[in-house]
Amino acid sequence: MTSRPALGTHGSGAPSRNQVRRPSKPANALPPDCIDPTLEDERPAAHNGASEARPPPRGRPHIFYSTLASSAFDLPIHSFPYQPTVNLPVPPRPGSLHLRDASQQRQILPGGTGVKDAPKLGVPETVPIPVHFPGEKAADVFPWTGTNAEDTLSEALVKAGVSNKPQIMNETNTARPSLWSNLKNKSGITTLSTLFVAVLEKRQQNGRLQTPNTFKPPPRLTLRDSTREGWLHDLANPTVSLRRLSRTIPHGLTGKVLLDQCLNKNIPLPRALWLAKCVGINELRAHKRKGQAGTVTWGRGWTSSVEQFLDSVISTIGQGDWKLRITYALQLATHLYKEHLLDDDHFLGWIPFGLDMCSSERLFIWLLVVAVPHYWNDISSCRQRGKRLAESLLNHLAKLSPIEDLAAPSTALQFLENSLLKLVTTRPACLLLPISWPKHSAALKALVTKRNLPQTAQAVEKLDGRNTRLLSFVRNGKSSSRTGAARVFHKLDSINYAAPIRIEDLSYECMEITSNAVQLISTLLHWACSCYRAGSHRIYLATRLLRRWSHLGADVYEGIIVYLQSMSWVKSGEIHVLLRIVAELVRSKHFSVGRYLQWLIATGSLGCDASLSLPSSWPVRLITEVPLTGLSDQVRTLRSTLLRGTAHSTELEEQALVNVKQSISQAVPAIFGLSLTIPSRIELNFAKLSGTIRLEIGIWLRQQVAQHAEVNEQSYLEQCEDLAILADVIGITASSLDMAVLASVADTLLYHMKTFRAIGAFDPLLGRLAMRYAAIRTVKFPERELLLSFQNLARTAQPDGQLLQLLAYDLSRLDQKNAVAACSPASDNMGEVMQHAGTCSDDEIERILSSGTSMDQNMMSRVLRKLVRNLEEHVDKGYRQFENHPAWFWRLRNFDEATFDVVLREWLETSIMACQLHILQIAIPPLVASSCMELSSFLDILRSCLANAKATQVLEPATIAIDLLRLLLPSGLSAMSCSSQDAYRYRTEQYKLCFTSDTRIIHCIGEVADLVLSTPSNSMLQTVSSLLSSETVLSIVKEHVVSDPDCLSKMKTGQSGQASFNTCFKTLLNGLLDPSGQWCLADISPEEQIIAVFKAASELSLPLCQAMIEHIFASSSALDTHAVDRLSVTVLNAVRTSMEKDQSQGLELLTNLEGPLADKIRSHAEREVLDASYFLLRGSTDGIASDCIVTAKMMQKYLTVIELTMGETPQADEQFAMLAALTDRFKGIFHALSECGGLGTPTNQATASPVVQVLAALLSLVASHGPQLLRNATQSHQAALMVALQDIVTHASLELFPSIIEHVFDVLIVLSDHISEDVRNQIARLESAKSTNSDRAYFIHSQKAPIDGWLMLTKPVIPPLEPPQPPNPNTTQNQSSPYQSPQMTSNTAAPQHRYFNQQQQQSQTLQPSQQTQHMRTYPQYAQHAAQPNRHLPAQLQRTPSHHASLSPLQQMQHMQQLQGLAQQRASQPSPIHSQRPTSVASPGGMGGLAGGNAAPSKAHTSYVNQQRDTQQYPFVQPRWEILAESSGNPTLNETAISLSLFGARRV
């Protein structure tokens, strides 16, 4: 006995309900027609979740190739709305191939297993509710009563089941046996053709209607409010028929009121549309009396009502059942739009406008409106609306993207992103926004990256390329095609020295730009030694980068030797900077001196010129500039041996080194422990010493300072220019507790901050100094000098806020400590003191400053003058004790800082205007050193005084302006009115003002030069020239040109333009651009200067070369116009030469050209482009290919010049001439494409055709000038250009060049944004006449064929018997183009107006048509009714539609007779070819189909000729009159169409 397995065991019984149920929709699937996509499915839980898969059977793992379904998702998914609960398993067939899975099935063993699985409790499954349909009855479900036929089992029911088979009669036979024998012979095709013609004729006769139009609009009645409400409630009730409601349509339901009533009463959509149509047709008939304008006005008003209705419903978001209301309103508006009951242009234009103006709270609803398929397709398929849609989406994305980073992503943002990605994928042309693309491209790329969509990312990249191609050149912008060297230069110039330099990141960034190590090292050395850059920081930054690259595996030695051998540094490089970089690398063992000496011996480079100052003698000079410390004895000996035969003597070098050491020992004996020795002032000229001596001196001084760290002396290391050793010395001395030494350390750090940042030592030294300052505070109170120096350093370096707070606290304590506890103000005790104005001793000043705690403005002014007078006496008498004066100024300021600033400003202005130069030179250094005045404040005061002097024509301040300017410029001379420490601090402030601040110092230099040169003195010219050509001014200008290329033009801002200033400014430019004088810019003509400037142009000298070009043109423009023309031609020739030599730097010179110069160069280049393409106008195509090859390359060069000089809009006459010329060129290209045939084959598509290259060049010119040209052009010029381009884009020869087609299409799109509506209509009519209505043309011009364009009414014209009458104006008006839409004529309601004209025409032809109603047939096929067919028997002749139809048996007999006749006609020509009349066929019609082949009689021929004279005109289907139900008479024609007009048409 076999035991039955228990229920619930594996492998037995029916599968569970969860296994057979189809899986639920994914979580992210949106329910259809739902307002809120985030709403969860409201179905029961049994339908929502997908059950987990059944665990695999025990004893064997579930293998991946098993054929059994492992989960519910593996079962087939059915599309039925309802599935049965349980599916019985199918038993396996014998010999099944699935035996390998049998082990997974539970086997029933004889005798039973003896073990049963424990029953498991589970959640009872809920029986799903069956699907219900209208009628409140379940589908195909009968409650069991036992009496149903399906409940009674029988043998037939068990075998065949239950099915509802239709009861049909058995067919007697099929037509195949009788037809096949006739069709397989030679006459089969002829027979089949005859049969098809007969079927078509019969089909058309049976489908033709005869009754005329009997449509009448339902009338409207004036009802009371209660009656109207009841009628509306009946309309909302589906059980009340429309036929009864149409008798009493209430009056007053129009516009927004009608829509609101439909919404409030929840009227079903079909009935709401019925009501809108009934009201609309009555309103149209009422407004017809006012003419066409009345119907147009009503149509626009109705559309505005729908828009206001939607807007009002959207504004109720969040109130009550707003979701249902918005859903209904949107569906109603969508149905009205689908029925074409709205002004499409106005409505589709309103939707993007609403999206653009909506707030973030309503963005989701407006996105939902836009996402309606009908709206989305029609908006995105038009350029005007699609562009507005794209801009709106991008603007909202720019607003919401920053918010997303701060909060969780919202549903509206996701919907927005999905809509934008859909637009990118389906309609990328809508995103052709060349003007705003740079603003939105980054956000769009970030979106694609976030979504991780590779295909969409490719579409965005392609879109970016298309927009970039359409972009006109942006003035003062960086070129996108910069070389790798230029990008490395930019990276090095843009380093922020105010923050620590991450040398690792900088080195990797440079390596990413240029991967070739030798090329990267050459680029770095070229930047470091360039004469167009200033500052010693370049040496140490380059050294650190080279060390880093050497650590990464680069051969630094090889790269340096290759660069030195190239001699590319000779023209613009400084050899001493290169040698100094090599010396630093020798110190760090990154450059092998021994290897270099071997290279010298192997190459024989020692036999060079005798003078080491020549560039060619660099191999020998290099070993005279390396440090000897650290070199082995063998290398030193070899170096001395190699230098014996040169101009450099090692013996003299050693003697000079000993002399310098002795002189320094005598000057600063304290460093060497000789504190008792009196120091002697010995002037040493370090500039004449070799690099080796200076480096050795630096190392020697560091060793001495390490032994005596209390010494304060840094000038010798600065003169040796060994700032790396100076950093080491500062690190040693920073451990001192001497406040004067620490103050000196702080000043030195501040002065060399940029260099120490490059070295990498600034932040460690600053931290060590801060720790030492904190240690001093715990022992004793810091002195004023240390606090002031450290405060200046902290303000510039910006360390942590705690250090600044400590310094501010200590300075406030110092003020309180120095204040004297006195009750009376200082003015009460100064009467006696100030009576003796002549006495100004130090004791009296000390007593004045200590006599009180407050001081008024007058008294402070007196004391300030007294302090200045005392300082002047000390200077005049030769006293060297100036330590007290900075402290006195500082104590005076502590009385009242605001009052002191006012007093000091008044005194400075008075002194400047009184030309008291000596007093200012004495007083300003201690005032700045004591932090009583910022040097930038004196700069502002000086500029203000000079401006007032120039305005009032007071020339006295001009005599001292240059000397006052020198107070602002750093120099090697120490201030004579302060101590050395204060002088160093003052020089630090000068350096900060000139090199690390803004460009105010550049403005001041230009203003001083202009004021001085405005004086009648001729001696000032040489003074200003020497000032502008000084090394200090040149260094300042170089520093600021890097960060602000326009600073040179700022120097000339506001100048009067006198010749003397231009001469001095030319001297400055010569010193900047040609410091060595090798170009001789001062001695050559302007044309030669331009050529020299183009030769000297590089990435580093670009701003200077641009300033030189501008200055040359500015100077020549003052002479005559011909000189400017000659210079323009010279520039063009220089640009052409640069292009031929592939020098992009020459083209970059044109970037910043402004004004008439750029216009002249651009106009010249434009003329050259047009002249180069003149061969396209000659008409003949002989030799056009060779001309195009030469022309295309030349045009590309000139196009580059045009883009670089793109500026203001050209004049009107130039615009018209260029527009006409471009139109002629495009017509010539179209002619060339047509005459040349094919331009290539698919095998050589990569090689562009010469004609296509010329086309691409002209397209670039149009893209840069087109918008400006079309704005002011006439309509005829606009239309001509657009038509010429549209002819090219549709030319068949360009199919092999899809990129060119895309380029032309993009240019057409951009140009279409700037043409008028009249031009659009004109172009649309031209395209309609060509019958080339395509989606591309509609997208560009926003003009589409009318919806009813396929409807063409054909009316025969029968010659009248009476004299001809003048034509009906209505009929003539209707004879327009078949694709002339209402939009083309700016007529919104034209369909309604045209319909009323049709009604008038129908009324004129109604009576004749009724008279011939029963004898009418198709005019084209009159031969079928006029004469019988000679080959067909009479019973097979085609009968008119009013004859009674034949029985099926008679039809079968007719078909058999037709087959016999077809066999007899097998030898005759086919009637399809010989008997088809040439009649006018309307679109969609078929013309003549068949007829007799005999010669027609004279009567028949005349009748056919008479029927050929027909007229066609469009038919506009009256959408308003297509009602669902009007009357109960089914025989009436209520389609609002006069069917008599279709007599000459086949369906």
From Swiss-Prot:
GO biological process: positive regulation of transcription by RNA polymerase II
Pro residues bias locations: 1357-1369
Taxonomy, superkingdom: Eukaryota
GO cellular component term of the entry, any: mediator complex
Compositional bias (Polar residues): 1379-1390, 1469-1480, 1499-1509
Region (Disordered) residue spans: 1-63, 1356-1509
Keywords for the protein's UniProt record, in alphabetical order: Activator, Nucleus, Repressor, Transcription, Transcription regulation
InterPro entries: ARM-type_fold (IPR016024), Mediator_Med12 (IPR019035)
GO molecular function: transcription coactivator activity
Alphabetical list of SMART domains matching this protein: Med12
Composition bias, Low complexity: 1398-1413, 1446-1468
Keyword Repeat: no
Listed Pfam families: ARM_SRB8, Med12
Subcellular location: Nucleus
Principal localisation: nucleus
Subunit (UniProt): Component of the SRB8-11 complex, which itself associates with the Mediator complex.
Function of the molecule: Component of the SRB8-11 complex. The SRB8-11 complex is a regulatory module of the Mediator complex which is itself involved in regulation of basal and activated RNA polymerase II-dependent transcription. The SRB8-11 complex may be involved in the transcriptional repression of a subset of genes regulated by Mediator. It may inhibit the association of the Mediator complex with RNA polymerase II to form the holoenzyme complex.
Family affiliation: Belongs to the Mediator complex subunit 12 family.
Record-given protein name: Mediator of RNA polymerase II transcription subunit 12
Lineage: Eukaryota, Fungi, Dikarya, Ascomycota, Pezizomycotina
